[in-house]
From Swiss-Prot:
Assigned protein family: Belongs to the UPF0122 family.
Signal peptide: none
SUPFAM superfamilies: Sigma3 and sigma4 domains of RNA polymerase sigma factors
Purpose: Might take part in the signal recognition particle (SRP) pathway. This is inferred from the conservation of its genetic proximity to ftsY/ffh. May be a regulatory protein.
Alphabetized PANTHER family for the sequence: UPF0122 PROTEIN CBO2450/CLC_2298, UPF0122 PROTEIN YLXM
Protein name in UniProt: UPF0122 protein Cthe_0771
Pfam families in alphabetical order: UPF0122 (PF04297)
């Protein structure tokens, strides 16, 4: 998995457990693609301060994931839903009743919504 995507997921899951400053800096860095210099200028702190906060915040996120495993569980569930969706799409609906085909289509759409959220 892409390191930036993984870090952004960790921030989504555990970000509110960080200090406000760490969350703000990591959010600007990961979700808004700010550079260290841009964050430093925006928050009136040194680049070293930004770097240290990113390092500490990321370490905290990693420790939380190691203990709780919520992102790992989320990704497993998403992959399972994708497998189910693939199986549903492979079903031949030509021999189904119109009503059964509509139900299957609704199930497919709901699973797609789950995967995309």
């Amino acid at each position: 998995m892409d390191k930036v995507y993984e870090a952004a997921l960790l921030l989504d899951f555990y970000g509110q457990l960080l200090t406000k400053r760490q969350f703000e800096i990591l959010d600007l860095y990961l979700n808004n693609d700010y550079s260290l210099g841009e964050i430093a200028e925006h928050l009136n702190i040194s680049r070293q301060g930004v770097y240290d906060n990113i390092k500490r915040g990321r370490a905290m996120l990693d420790r939380m994931e190691e203990k709780l495993g919520l992102v790992h569980k989320f990704l497993q569930q998403k992959n399972r839903a994708l497998e189910i969706l693939k199986d549903i799409k492979s079903i031949d609906i030509s021999s189904m009743s119109v009503e059964d085909a509509k139900i299957l289509k609704r199930v497919e759409e709901r699973i797609e919504e789950i995967v995309e959220s």
